[in-house]
Amino acid sequence: MVKAMEQEQETYKSRLFHFKNMNENSASRHVKSWSSDCAMRMDGSDNLDDDDNDMMMFRSQPGKCGSVDRPSLPIGGVTPNRNDKLPRVSSSDSMEALIILQAAMEQMKEKFSKLLLGEDMSGGGKGVSSALALSNAITNLAASAFGEQRRLEPMAVDRKTRWRREIGWLISVADYIVEFAPTQQTNKDGTSMEVMSTRQRTDLLCNIPALKKLDAMLLDCLDKFKDQDEFYYVKKDSPDSCETRNDEKWWLPAVKVPPNGLSEISRRFLQSQKECVNQVLKAAMAINAQVLSEMEIPESYLESLPKNGRASLGDVIYRMITVEMFDADQFLIEMDLSSEHKILDLKNRIEASIVIWKRKMVQKDTKSPWGSTVSIEKREQFEERAETILLLLKQGFPGISQSSLDISKIQFNRDVGLAILESYSRVLESLAHTVMSRIEDVLYADQLTQEPTNNAPSKNRYSLKENEKLREERLSFTEDMASGTLSDVMQWGNKNNEMKKESFFGDREKPLLSKVTGIMTNNKKSSYLDNLGAMRSPTARYS
């Protein structure tokens, strides 16, 4: 009896082993079918309805479980567990990922719907152009992502993730801006022929990858300050902040460094990061300037210009630009650059005069019956001088507000590709300027520990050697003026000469070009990106 029971047990074990092998093969086939169906569902549709779920389950399990003949096991037998081999379709992780994906898709739909409506939620067609709506979207995204970057530290994970995700959505429009280009096509018989095919527009093909690289470099620079422990920040109302308080940036937290200053390794690291960010800033400025130069000047801006460059610049500035002995650096020393309003006003005047002179060189001033009093060669010379001054202003004040000409170009631009390049490069330029400013704050706090005697009078973060060098240049320029020939003096004119001497020698303490970065924030309570974020469309700051 016992021997018969043992034989029966061995028979059941052999049948169970055979059934288990069949189950494993079936499970592997089910997993492959389920994976392919899930991939098709994720790529082909947004929502999973009940009918779709039923269809997916039907396709993933072509055979019914009840169709398998299960052997009857005796009492005490072991039932095979099929759940050990089959994956769980509705796990908590997959459901959470699906919810996040659906939320991101809804957010993307909302964003692109606003872009298509042109910021006009009523749908009445009174919104802005697609180019301006896209430019505003990139500007507002950067303001929300980088507006709170008040410390030299990595970005928050959620803000960095949102920035990378949404900027990818917005600049993905550039992938569909194409142009025709000739390509060689080889036929089956071996002959080749030239056909026209589409490719991404050349300016986008070159600049979009470059801007992405600059973006990654800036974020990587911030990530490198994650584990630093040599400097920290204190709140602006803390008693410890009075020692290193910079009145020009009173709303920012104060930087604290060790009593003996930073180590040599940290100081070199900060200098290297500053140089890297400076290169990013220059590259972003170059791309932005190139894109703005390619935009057409609106007719409304041309109609608002005065008749000649002298009326735009004013008599004083016009005489300073049109003299024989012209020096752009000396011109900026002579000008009053004590506030952002004055800097922006000078920038607007210079740009307006450049546009006027360029138009007159093209039109050759045929309206005047007596001809122009200024030759074309002189106009070209004046235009080059004005462009040099404008370039120095942009380099000396990278965080300055946009000029009237730039705002007009952005408002009336209809090229979506140029709008993407301009806004993307502009926000990267602002971010690079912010990061460089935060690095300079740390270096300034370290400099105070090395030179405590210069704590009170030093409101700028530039060394005295640079100021002395500029003073020596000023004195050498004065000596050159004094040793000029009689013809040079006659060209200046007696009245103008007296005016220049009074303005040049009367105020020795006017801000130099090396001191310009501090005056931009005298009366500002928010950053440049914060101001841009609240703007529906680019508008002039000063009326």
UniProtKB/Swiss-Prot annotation:
User: How is this protein annotated for GO cellular component?
Assistant: cytoplasm; nucleus
Q: Which GO terms describe its molecular function?
A: guanyl-nucleotide exchange factor activity
Per UniProt, residues of the PRONE domain are: 95-456
Give expression by tissue: Highly expressed in elongating regions of roots and pollen grains. Expressed in flowers, and at lower levels in leaves and stems.
The transmembrane segments are none
Key words of the record: Cytoplasm, Guanine-nucleotide releasing factor
- Compartment(s): Cytoplasm
Please, which domain of life does this record's source organism belong to?
Eukaryota
Q: Name one GO biological process term.
A: root development
Which residue stretches belong to region Disordered? 61-89
Main localization of the protein?
cytoplasm
Q: Which Pfam families would you find in this protein's record?
A: PRONE
> InterPro entries attached here?
PRONE_dom, RopGEF
- What other comment is given for this protein? Plants overexpressing ROPGEF11 show retarded root elongation and irregular root hair formation.
- Subunit-level organization: Interacts with ARAC4/ROP2, ARAC3/ROP, ARAC9/ROP8, PHYA and PHYB.
* Domain note: The PRONE (plant-specific Rop nucleotide exchanger) domain is responsible for the GEF activity.
Q: What does this protein do?
A: Guanine-nucleotide exchange factor (GEF) that acts as an activator of Rop (Rho of plants) GTPases by promoting the exchange of GDP for GTP. Functions as a light-signaling switch that functions in root growth and development through the activation of Rop in a phytochrome-dependent manner. May act as a negative regulator of phytochrome-mediated primary root development.
Query: Any idea what this protein is called?
Result: Rop guanine nucleotide exchange factor 11
State the organism named in the record: Arabidopsis thaliana (Mouse-ear cress)
Q: Which gene encodes it?
A: ROPGEF11
